[in-house]
């Protein structure tokens, strides 16, 4: 499967070559299982389309479509630069990249936002970005569960959004 081709339409919306090339390289590193699983392995937290096979891809594309719409608004463009907007564009693709853990568990692992952040920080690619940019994108991924930070099945408490960008990535 050509992973990059799946996201070609999203990549075409990037405004900077630097972050587009980085995102393209990172897409190649996403575990294969992400391209076949439903977005909700328990069938509870996503719509019917996203709970079907390949639903995770639908989830990413829907998230990205809304993200791109909002990033194109005059108000948002006045408050952000091209690079910031492109980092935000990475989030729909990266936020669930390790959704079922590093080994592809049958179910979503509660810690997956933290695993996604770790994956962003630690993965080296040909068109890599600086550590501050990686940390920014990682934090967007880590806080994407919003106020739903805990579960009885895990001792891990996920971080809540701390700023407007993180809040935006949670509720889009």
Question: Where would I find each of the regions flagged by the language model?
Answer:
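Histidine/acidic-rich helix-loop-helix segments that form or flank divalent-metal centers
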Residues: 78-79, 88, 128-172
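Acidic/His-rich, divalent-metal-binding segments that scaffold phosphate/diphosphate chemistry
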Residues: 1-104
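An active-site-proximal "capping" alpha-helix that borders the catalytic cofactor pocket
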Residues: 60-66, 110-126
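Histidine-centered active-site/metal-ligand motif
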Residues: 56-59, 95, 110-113, 144-145
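Short capping loops/turns at secondary-structure boundaries
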Residues: 56, 83-86, 90, 109-113, ...
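Metal-dependent catalytic cores of enzymes that make or break cyclic nucleotides
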Residues: 103-108, 157
């Amino acid at each position: 499967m050509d992973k990059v081709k799946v996201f070609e339409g999203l990549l075409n919306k990037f405004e900077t070559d630097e972050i587009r090339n980085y995102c393209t390289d990172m897409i190649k590193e996403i575990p294969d299982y992400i391209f076949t699983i439903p977005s909700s392995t328990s069938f509870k937290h996503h719509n019917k389309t996203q709970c079907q096979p390949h639903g995770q891809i639908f989830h990413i594309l829907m998230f990205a479509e809304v993200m791109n719409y909002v990033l194109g608004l005059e108000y948002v463009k006045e408050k952000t630069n091209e690079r910031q907007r492109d980092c935000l564009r990475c989030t729909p693709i990266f936020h669930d990249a390790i959704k079922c853990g590093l080994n592809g568990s049958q179910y979503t692992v509660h810690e997956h936002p933290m695993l996604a952040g770790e994956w962003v920080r630690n993965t080296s690619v040909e068109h890599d970005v600086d550590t501050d940019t990686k940390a920014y994108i990682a934090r967007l991924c880590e806080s994407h569960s919003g106020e739903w930070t805990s579960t009885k099945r895990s001792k891990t408490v996920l971080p809540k959004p701390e700023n407007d960008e993180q809040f935006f990535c949670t509720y889009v």
